[in-house]
């Protein structure tokens, strides 16, 4: 990737492998809980859509984020965290659509 298109991943190669790019999206029914969750996410990530955040996190910060998400979990809601570049891991909390993705392609 050339430097002008690499604005989000502007880190040196030594630390590049240790950080993960994550996308967090959610569907929380309760207004108060949804507001509190978005405020929580603002400490870790950048809002890119109404219910979608992106972040580039160290392993320690990633673990903190995941641990904090548990406080907002409700069986009627859906919170999904996509870890891109770090094992291609997807975690979800609450209501699950039941869909299983065999292969993920990010364009």
Regions found by a protein language model. Name each.
Residues 1-4, 8-23, 29-107:
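Basic nucleic-acid-binding interfaces
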């Amino acid at each position: 990737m050339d430097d002008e298109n690499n604005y989000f991943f502007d880190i040196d190669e030594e630390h590049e492998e240790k950080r993960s790019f994550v996308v967090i999206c959610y569907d929380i029914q309760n207004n108060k809980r949804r507001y509190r969750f978005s405020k929580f996410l603002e400490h870790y990530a950048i809002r890119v859509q109404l219910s979608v955040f992106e972040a580039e996190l160290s392993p320690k910060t990633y673990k903190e984020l995941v641990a904090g998400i548990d406080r907002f979990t409700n069986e009627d809601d859906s919170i999904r965290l996509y870890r891109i570049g770090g094992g291609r891991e997807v975690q979800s909390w609450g209501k699950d659509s039941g869909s299983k993705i065999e292969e993920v392609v990010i364009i």
